[in-house]
């Protein structure tokens, strides 16, 4: 089908899905897992690029997992924010979500930046120049407000523009320190902002948090197929890793003029967008967040967009539950996520 700027029809979308290529080769089967005694030694490991790493890695349960579980036992809800591709607004959404939770003065909120090579949460929260303080209780998070704390590698850099050039083991070690040593105290919500894709950081966070209990993951996308194709991989990763998918959020879904209120489509959903994908993959669609240039300005200045522009359509989408995902004054994550929009079967 030739490229076109016209709105795609349902027939065109179905035709695209039918012609989608299959994997050239099936994925490896019967992997014993990195913690197994047979890791790197079994017949299924032959030819695997990670065979030597698995064979030489220490086996058995990680003793730090019990320490992390105890440390995080006072946190009621832990939410991962994932994206298949960079640039879809995952960290922006994480910061908006944190501010929206913290808008309830009775809620205590933490946000942890595990995107070690591209940390942006400190900047978005307006605390980029702060440093970590260490006490007998552990590392103290940087408090943005009385009920909103943040933790990021940015607080540890000698110079704010220093690059992080680390391999997997060193990244995993710092993530473990964030989970084991940071003294969050009692929190209602801990939001974990992750790097794009499915990398070492995701595996580390999942394995270290599994015992302490994670509510699940929110996946952020934009409407274009180039983003959705990576979301499918992210969904596959979550299912294989045993991470509950709370739902899909479509960011930058359109632009609403602040003067006349007219909504314009910026990134056309050539294959049906996030809602169609969520329906097809059997996960909740949590709603859409429109573009607003003031979001970028608020993030650059480290201000809460939700507080500064409470009547913006984007703020409304975050606060008042767009298609089943409401965060403003939320009492329990499960109550909201269980009522997310799985039943809407409209075609796009």
Swiss-Prot record:
SUPFAM superfamilies cross-referenced by the UniProt entry: P-loop containing nucleoside triphosphate hydrolases
Amino-acid positions noted as binding ATP in the UniProt annotation, renumbered to this chain: 84-91
Binding site for [4Fe-4S] cluster 2: 257, 260
Cofactor(s) the protein needs: [4Fe-4S] cluster
Principal subcellular localization: cytoplasm
Superkingdom, taxonomy of origin: Eukaryota
Residues binding [4Fe-4S] cluster 1: 31, 45, 48, 54
Note on how the cofactor is bound: Binds 4 [4Fe-4S] clusters per heterotetramer. Contains two stable clusters in the N-termini of nbp35 and two labile, bridging clusters between subunits of the nbp35-cfd1 heterotetramer.
InterPro entries xref list: Mrp-like_CS, Mrp/NBP35_ATP-bd, NUBP1/Nbp35, P-loop_NTPase, YlxH/NBP35
Keyword entries, A-Z: 4Fe-4S, ATP-binding, Cytoplasm, Iron, Iron-sulfur, Metal-binding, Nucleotide-binding
Ranges where the record places region Disordered: 23-42
One Gene Ontology term, aspect cellular component: cytosol
Family: Belongs to the Mrp/NBP35 ATP-binding proteins family. NUBP1/NBP35 subfamily.
Subunit structure: Heterotetramer of 2 nbp35 and 2 cfd1 chains.
Function as written in the Swiss-Prot or TrEMBL entry: Component of the cytosolic iron-sulfur (Fe/S) protein assembly (CIA) machinery. Required for maturation of extramitochondrial Fe-S proteins. The nbp35-cfd1 heterotetramer forms a Fe-S scaffold complex, mediating the de novo assembly of an Fe-S cluster and its transfer to target apoproteins.
Identification of the protein by name: Cytosolic Fe-S cluster assembly factor nbp35
Organism: Aspergillus terreus (strain NIH 2624 / FGSC A1156)
Lineage: Eukaryota, Fungi, Dikarya, Ascomycota, Pezizomycotina
Gene: nbp35
């Amino acid at each position: 089908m030739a490229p076109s700027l016209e709105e795609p029809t349902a027939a065109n979308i179905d035709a695209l899905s039918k012609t989608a290529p299959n994997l050239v080769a099936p994925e490896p089967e019967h992997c014993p897992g990195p913690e197994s005694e047979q890791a790197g030694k079994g017949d299924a490991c032959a030819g695997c690029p990670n065979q030597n790493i698995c064979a030489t890695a220490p086996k058995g349960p990680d003793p730090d997992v019990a320490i992390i579980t105890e440390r995080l036992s006072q946190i009621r809800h832990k939410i991962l924010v994932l994206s298949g591709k960079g640039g879809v607004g995952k960290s922006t959404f994480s910061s908006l979500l944190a501010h929206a939770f913290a808008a309830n003065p009775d809620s205590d909120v933490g946000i942890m930046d595990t995107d070690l090579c591209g940390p942006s949460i400190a900047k978005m929260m307006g605390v980029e120049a702060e440093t970590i303080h260490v006490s007998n209780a552990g590392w103290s998070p940087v408090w943005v407000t009385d009920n909103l704390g943040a933790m990021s590698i940015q607080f540890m850099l000698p110079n704010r523009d220093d690059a992080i050039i680390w391999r997997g083991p060193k990244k995993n070690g710092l993530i473990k320190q964030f989970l084991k040593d940071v003294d969050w105290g009692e929190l209602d919500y801990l939001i974990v902002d992750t790097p794009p894709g499915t990398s070492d950081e995701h595996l580390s966070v999942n394995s270290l948090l599994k015992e302490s209990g994670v509510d699940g993951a929110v996946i952020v996308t934009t409407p274009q197929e180039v983003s959705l194709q990576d979301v499918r991989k992210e969904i596959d990763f979550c299912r294989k890793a045993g991470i509950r998918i709370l739902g899909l959020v479509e960011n930058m879904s359109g632009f609403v003029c602040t003067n006349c209120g007219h909504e314009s489509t910026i990134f056309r959903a050539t294959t049906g967008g996030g809602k169609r994908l969520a329906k097809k993959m059997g996960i909740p669609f949590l709603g859409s967040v429109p573009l607003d240039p003031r979001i970028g300005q608020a993030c650059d200045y480290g201000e809460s967009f939700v507080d500064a522009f409470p009547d913006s359509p984007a703020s409304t989408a975050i606060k008042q539950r767009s298609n089943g995902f409401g965060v403003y004054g939320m009492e329990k994550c499960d109550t909201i996520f269980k009522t997310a929009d799985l039943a809407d079967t409209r075609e796009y």
